[in-house]
Amino acid sequence: MKLLSKLILTLALATYASASESFRYINWDNPPHDVTFYEGDVLQFTTNEGRNSTITLISDTENGDKSFDGVLNEDQRSFVQKALPPGRYTFKDLNSGSKSIIRVKESKELAKEVRPIDRLKDNADAANTENAQKSPNTQSTQKGSPKSDAKEASPKTDAKEASPKSDAKEASPKTDTKQGSSPKTDTKSSTQKPSSSSDSSKAKAEANTAANNEEAEHVEKGASNTLKASLSIISAACVLSLGYLL
């Protein structure tokens, strides 16, 4: 029995050692160059969320079809697209047997980098063509602009040649005012009008002050009358109280 148990233990250790030797761990955060995959290789990488993940290689065929253990999630799919060398990769679940095939090509990543640059170049070329089309229109407008024609025959020079100011100077109405009645008397009469208005305002102010004084006198008289009445009532009450006591 002891011999059988020892044999079983040795066989188990041998199988475990052989199995452990068949699994080779490859860190794909810093992937090696020109790597060849073998059966049992385990690819280790860090996901976008910072978790550690692994993909196990099941078989490596001659035509480049590489089969891995497990169904791919989004992180593993992006990992395969970026990290693995070009080839056709088959990922299958050992329990369910479902498969997912991914083909990795170098041109796919290059196209993503080239397309935005090409779009920017196309936009720049389109903008240059638009500017080139607009530029001859502006030159034509500058060559035959109506402003230059207006300057050549402007109505301002005609107005200066025959300005009405010189005619007004020749026959100015000032000499007529000197010969006739002077306008100074009119200005005096015009200045007398505001003085009359000021007199009326003064009269109104005096009337208001007089009315206010009369109201104040009435108030003072009313107050004195109330005081007198209250004093007479108090004196009468005192007399009555004294008479009652006596």
UniProtKB/Swiss-Prot annotation:
Residues 1-19 form the signal peptide. Residues 145-176 are annotated as: 3.5 X 9 AA tandem repeats of S-P-K-[ST]-D-A-K-E-A. Glycans are attached at residue 52. Residues 113-124, 146-177 have a biased composition (Basic and acidic residues). Residues 113-223 are annotated as: Disordered. Keywords: Glycoprotein, Repeat, Signal. Residues 126-145 have a biased composition (Polar residues). Residues 181-213 have a biased composition (Low complexity). Sequence repeats lie at residues 145-153, 154-162, 163-171, 172-176. This is Protein 3F. It comes from Dictyostelium discoideum. The lineage of its organism: Eukaryota, Amoebozoa, Evosea, Eumycetozoa, Dictyostelia.
